[in-house]
């Protein structure tokens, strides 16, 4: 709270961020004097390690917008290392196996309260998330070019790393592409949403459409914009104003935890909520129901191999039925609500 202002709302939102200094200050693109280094826990399964590395280092695409090359570096903890993954001297992506995990991961960090400089961070990701990824493969199929397990782990890692470099949730990010556009890689590139900081469901194409990305594997346009605003050195007032002016465009819409529509009576903008997809959730849900119903009918065949258990079948069945329930709830939330235009105070 800014006690030196006479504004009606004196609250100010401040980002915590890492200290990045260019080796070559005049250069448009320069490596930092000290990069942000994240370690991958040596206990990470071998197949998963390169996915986690990519989920870390792909953030360099956003930092290049801010003028930094190789700002984020991923290293794999050596098998013979004598330091613990919980050592605060190392920023580590490590794994937990909780009995009933509430989240697939979380990304806490430690900042200097006087300056806002981040000095340490950890990402804890649940082993249950890896199991979920393998189940995605079993249910939806995969190829080396379009692997839901790989995309899920990259996406999850990106999201948690995003928290540890200063970004909050953005639950408006899914409201960017149309319900058919979101399956078209020529439109979405390597994303499905405007920001990796949303909670997005697996993106499944309906019958008749080619499968696009299951999950985003690069920072979205909002992420690149936010990192540029936060980390670009020596922004002039004019440059800062130009960046802020973009906030009214669809790719830069923002709504975080306090804005997200949830249980009845909590917030009123249906575009800002967890677990939805596309800017026409009614059409997307109708498409998804067809896909889910078809997959439910296929479950007996999918789980007919020797060694498959009734428990595997039942878990997948309830998962698919629950997915239908979540999307019905999202559709119901479209009725009788209001759109909030945070960056457009004169708009009705």
Give the positions of each predicted feature.
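Polar, glycine-rich mid-to-C-terminal structural blocks
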Residues: 117-156, 211-247
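Stable alpha-helical elements in mature extracytoplasmic
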Residues: 48-55, 149, 153, 157
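Zn2+-dependent metallopeptidase catalytic core
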Residues: 43-71
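Auxiliary tRNA-acceptor-end handling modules of aminoacyl-tRNA synthetases
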Residues: 1-44, 62, 66, 77-149, ...
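Short conserved micro-motifs at the rims of enzyme active sites and ligand-binding pockets
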Residues: 50, 105, 134, 206-212
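Conserved catalytic/binding loops enriched for acidic/polar residues
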Residues: 174-343, 347
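Sec-exported extracytoplasmic/periplasmic mature domains
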Residues: 57-68, 162-163, 167, 202, ...
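The catalytic-center signature of Zn2+-dependent metalloproteases
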Residues: 76-97, 151-207
């Amino acid at each position: 709270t800014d006690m030196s202002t006479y504004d009606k709302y004196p609250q100010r939102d401040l980002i915590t961020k890492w200290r990045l200094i260019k080796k070559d200050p005049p250069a448009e693109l320069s490596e930092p004097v000290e990069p942000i280094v994240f370690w991958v826990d040596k206990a990470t399964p071998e197949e998963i390690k390169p996915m986690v590395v990519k989920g870390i280092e792909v953030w360099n695409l956003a930092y290049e917008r801010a003028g930094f090359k190789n700002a984020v570096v991923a290293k794999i903890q050596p098998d013979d290392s004598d330091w613990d993954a919980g050592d605060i001297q190392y920023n580590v992506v490590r794994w937990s196996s909780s009995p009933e995990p509430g989240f697939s991961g979380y990304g806490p960090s430690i900042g200097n309260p006087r300056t806002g400089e981040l000095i340490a961070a950890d990402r804890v990701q649940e082993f249950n998330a890896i199991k979920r990824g393998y189940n995605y493969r079993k249910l939806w199929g995969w190829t080396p070019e379009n692997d839901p397990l790989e995309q899920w782990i990259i996406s999850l890692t990106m999201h948690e790393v995003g928290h540890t470099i200063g970004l909050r949730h953005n639950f408006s990010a899914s409201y960017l592409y149309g319900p058919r556009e979101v399956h078209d890689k020529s439109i979405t590139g390597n994303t499905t949403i405007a920001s990796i900081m949303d909670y997005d469901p697996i993106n499944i194409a309906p019958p008749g459409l080619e499968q696009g990305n299951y999950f985003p594997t690069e920072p979205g346009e909002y992420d690149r914009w936010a990192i540029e605003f936060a980390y670009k050195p020596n922004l002039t007032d004019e440059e800062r104003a130009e960046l802020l002016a973009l906030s009214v465009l669809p790719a830069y819409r923002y709504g975080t935890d306090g804005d997200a529509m949830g249980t009845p009576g909590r917030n009123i903008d249906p575009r800002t909520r967890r677990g939805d997809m596309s800017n026409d959730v009614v059409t997307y849900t109708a498409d998804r129901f067809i896909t889910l119903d078809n997959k439910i009918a296929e479950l007996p065949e999918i789980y007919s191999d020797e060694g498959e258990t009734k428990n595997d079948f039942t878990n997948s069945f309830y998962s698919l039925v629950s997915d239908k329930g979540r999307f019905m709830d999202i559709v119901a939330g479209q009725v009788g609500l209001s759109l909030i235009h945070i960056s457009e105070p004169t708009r009705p």
